């Protein structure tokens, strides 16, 4: 595993220096995928200089008046609109070192790349009116689930567009909104927290959203502090996200180690003045939905919800590769909960996860329920180093109590060369292995385990929840035979619970994780950890 750290360092150095690609590639189930590259200087159609100087990562002093909420939107959008296909709009520092741009919703077009240069940040407006799609409720929490906010950056039906560079996109989720009923009284993340406290639906903008289209690229950019999901692809064919960093909340809205002062977080006070990953709700990192040929490689994700959520609600999602990534706080590399149109052919390789013993931490997770279930098949996790994760392995078709007739079916799942180093704080940890058996349906979880090793105290099997049975239940285990399975002796076969075991564990050494973990701050200076 450890050869990748040299590659990561080279790639990071190349981006910081503004160099082109280092020539790395990854092997996906559908073929080789090459590292993207920065555009040549000759391919830059327009260079725009920053005019804002952030103060400690904040531009709140600039746009307290909502009339000044997006001073750079028109010139960035005009540059994109007038840029020929195959060229890039480049955002650079100003002549006096200014590094900030401030904009509302922008639209990419086919063949055009937005290049955010080293040290430059594109800040998102905190005026909900700059994102509202016509419903008039962006920046509020509603009983309706109809989405009312456009994303900061939208790529609709584009071919060959993307966002690259060693700069950053900052959604300013911890800043007070400046218009509407919540003006100057709630931050975006306070609004999101109303989902938990009042059961309302947040109407907050995402940062990057693709609709349909093909060949979309994200390369090197840091994406942080989104009011909602960071990156979502919907119905897109060919998505490459390489060397990206998702850091939420960043130091602009937190403190070192996420050690917020008592009473400063949104579960205790409104508006909050300090945020932790546990208190920035619905801030998924990378969500490919209804998409094909998706790569996330050499990337780092720290956030308040799913690191990744692979979804299939209105079309199948298939052919995905997650390679050489580092995950920190978050709710796991997840499939679901929407799986009704099917997820298939996914490989996860060389992944490290350090959950920092968060109360909401998940590792590898497939989740769904009878309202949105479908077939999830041919999923391989190979080469995983994990520590301090509350729920390391979760295969759960009873994710909620919502009823329906779209039944989950998880088949041909493989977990191999998995090594969990335990919990530094000795928190109570659990695992979930469940097939779907209800409503006269019987869809067993079929899963192969090979060299699945836990150091220290084994996580317990999860108890019953949301109408489902205690774990394991409805599971057909196969032991691959190469390496051990630490909890093999705890699996009780039974015709009553439909738990079967085929094969025997092997004796190979556990995966070496001694050099696997990388402090996030070493690659993302805005990180509190």
UniProtKB/Swiss-Prot annotation:
What GO terms in the biological process aspect are recorded for it? carbohydrate metabolic process; cell wall organization
Query: What protein am I looking at?
Result: Polygalacturonase
Q: Known InterPro entries for this protein? A: GH28_Enzymes, Glyco_hydro_28, Pectin_lyas_fold, Pectin_lyase_fold/virulence
UniProt subunit comment:
Monomer.
Q: What class of enzyme is it?
A: hydrolase
Principal localization reads: secreted
Q: Which GO terms describe its cellular component?
A: extracellular region
Q: What is its EC number?
A: 3.2.1.15
Q: Which GO terms describe its molecular function?
A: polygalacturonase activity
> Which intervals of the chain are annotated as region Required for PGA export across the outer membrane and catalytic activity?
516-529
Explain the purpose of this protein.
Contributes to the wilt disease production on tomato.
Record field: catalytic activity: (1,4-alpha-D-galacturonosyl)n+m + H2O = (1,4-alpha-D-galacturonosyl)n + (1,4-alpha-D-galacturonosyl)m
The protein's organism comes out as: Ralstonia solanacearum (Pseudomonas solanacearum)
């Amino acid at each position: 595993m450890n050869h990748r750290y040299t590659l990561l360092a080279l790639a990071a150095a190349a981006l910081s220096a503004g160099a082109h690609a280092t020539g790395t590639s990854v092997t996906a189930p559908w073929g080789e995928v090459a590292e993207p590259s920065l555009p040549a200087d000759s391919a830059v159609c327009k260079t725009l200089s920053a005019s804002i100087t952030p103060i400690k990562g904040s531009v709140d002093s600039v746009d307290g008046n909502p009339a000044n909420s997006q001073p750079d939107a028109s010139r960035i959008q005009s540059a994109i609109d007038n840029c020929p296909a195959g060229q890039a709009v480049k955002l650079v520092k100003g002549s006096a070192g200014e590094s900030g741009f401030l904009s509302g919703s922008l639209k990419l077009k086919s063949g055009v790349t937005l290049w955010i240069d080293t040290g430059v940040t594109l800040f998102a407006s905190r005026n909900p009116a700059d994102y509202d799609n016509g419903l008039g409720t962006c920046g509020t929490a509603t009983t309706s689930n109809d989405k009312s906010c456009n994303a900061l950056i939208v790529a609709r039906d584009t071919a060959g567009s993307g966002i690259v560079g060693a700069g950053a996109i900052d959604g300013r989720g911890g800043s007070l909104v400046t218009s509407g009923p919540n003006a100057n009284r709630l931050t975006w993340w306070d609004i999101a927290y109303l989902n938990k406290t009042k059961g309302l639906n947040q109407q907050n903008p995402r940062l990057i959203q693709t609709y349909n289209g093909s060949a979309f690229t994200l390369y090197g950019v840091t994406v942080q502090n989104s009011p909602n999901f960071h990156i979502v692809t919907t119905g897109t064919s060919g998505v490459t996200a390489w060397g990206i960093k998702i850091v939420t909340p960043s130091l602009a809205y937190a403190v070192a180690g996420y050690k917020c002062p008592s009473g400063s977080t949104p579960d205790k006070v409104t508006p909050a003045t300090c945020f932790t990953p546990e208190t920035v709700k619905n801030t998924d990192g990378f969500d490919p939905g209804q998409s094909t040929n998706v790569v996330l490689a050499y990337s780092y994700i720290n956030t308040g919800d799913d690191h990744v959520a692979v979804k299939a609600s209105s079309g199948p999602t298939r052919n995905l590769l997650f390679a050489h990534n580092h995950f920190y706080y978050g709710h796991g590399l997840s499939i679901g909960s929407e799986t009704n149109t099917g997820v298939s052919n996914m490989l996860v390789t060389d992944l490290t996860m350090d959950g920092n013993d968060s109360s909401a931490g998940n590792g590898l997770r497939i989740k769904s329920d009878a309202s949105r279930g479908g077939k999830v098949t041919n999923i391989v996790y190979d080469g995983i180093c994990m520590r301090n994760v509350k729920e390391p392995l979760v295969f759960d078709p009873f994710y909620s109590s919502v009823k329906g007739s779209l039944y989950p079916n998880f088949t041909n799942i493989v977990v191999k060369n998995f090594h969990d180093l335990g919990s530094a704080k000795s928190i109570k940890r659990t695992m979930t292995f469940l097939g779907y058996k209800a409503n006269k349906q019987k869809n067993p979880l079929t899963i192969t385990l090979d060299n699945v090793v836990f150091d220290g105290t084994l996580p317990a099997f999860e108890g019953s929840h949301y109408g489902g049975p205690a774990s394991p239940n409805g599971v057909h285990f196969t032991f691959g035979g190469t390496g051990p399975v630490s909890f093999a002796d705890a699996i009780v076969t039974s015709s009553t619970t439909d738990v079967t075991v085929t094969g025997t564990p092997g004796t190979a050494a556990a995966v070496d994780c001694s050099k696997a973990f990388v402090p996030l701050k070493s690659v993302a200076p805005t990180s509190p950890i």
